[in-house]
Amino acid sequence: VTAAENNAQSANFDWLVDDFVHRVHGATHALILSADGLPLAASSSVTSDESEQLAAISSGMLSLAHHGSSLFDKGECEQIILRLRHGYFLFMGIGSGAGLAVLTSAEAQMRVVAYEMTQFVENTGHALTPEVRADLRRVVTARRPRD
């Protein structure tokens, strides 16, 4: 796979996430992240710095949820929903290697957002193979400013 193909693939996932934010009423930010907490694709409303922080926060919350569900033998964590003063944070796994994090406004209808996230995961999950995730990771790493 060439660098140009990697960039095109990354742009496709960025477009899909951006489209999600524009299509789903109340969604303000969205991010696909790897299981190890690295951003893979983000909506245009998420800056590069924010994408890294949101990915790390999401990964940390998922880890806490997994440990809590394991401790009480409740099975795998399927989604996380946090109600914030000015909106919501939602996380849903995309297979075992990635996840979708979404921030919304306070006016967002959670039922609609959760449904749209489920549709997004079902429609894109098959495309996020380990190879594609590795390619996206390389593209994101190459985009980072060097100190």
Enumerate the language-model features and the residues they cover:
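Acidic, low-complexity cytosolic segments
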Residues: T2-A27, D36-D147
